[in-house]
Amino acid sequence: MIYGILALGVYITYKILDFPDLTVDGSFPFGAAITVRLINGFGVPAILTLPIAFLGGALVGICTGLIHVKLKVRDLLSGIIMMTGLYTINLWVAGSGYVAIFDKDNIFNNSFVNSITPGFLVNFKNVIIIFLITMVAKYLLDWYMSTKSGFLLRAVGDNDTIVTSLGVDKGLVKIVGLSIANGLVSLSGCIYAQQQRSFEISIGTGAVVIGLASVIIGTSLFKKVTFFRVTSSVVVGSILYKACVAVAMFAGISPNAIKLITAVLFLIILVISMDRKKVKAC
């Protein structure tokens, strides 16, 4: 379910802003890098790494937005530039390409969590904690999207002339959207690092594909389910995606082939969805 938070971030850029943001592949490990540095280097309590990682990712999103809006660089190239630069930044922040935090407290294993967790739930505490954080992120995003700022965010993706006609800077709205999206992605990386108790420089490879696959699976399967919010379908889509990966690995498919298969399936889904849009347009 960690990837559910990642998928929420990708949902903002892909579905709402219509912005192909490849920054995700860099902001996911950026959140992890911040986390291990704060825990290892500064002894910051694990719970505080969550908002700090979110703010770090938000800053990354702002940089992507500024490159696109102020420097007039195309959206795809803006993401590629940030993703490339973040590789080095992540190494600087973490200190090396691999950092372990096995002997440190984290949000899943600390004196407070251990003291309040009933014995029969010990084996499920990781899932429960991730579920709670994901639900908080989801409902906060739902709330934000119901505000005036959230309305402007949806409008700038559908028809940015509406935003301009309201006297609002559409570029600023895009920057805000990118900051929230990458904040969520970085938060996901923060939780991932604490679950794995380590940081590895390559953990962001393919993160955007995972996020997009989750968004497309969720929104496609639950498009006609009226009582399901889109954010809920996106989170469920991430769970279904990981379940499919688990089944594939159980069936004996090499882990090295999983991402290739994911990319091919993702391409097929995209082509099918584009064909459906063309049919509807006709």
Spans of model-derived segments:
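Transmembrane helix-bundle core of multi-pass membrane transporters
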Residues: D75, G79, L86-S146, V176, ...
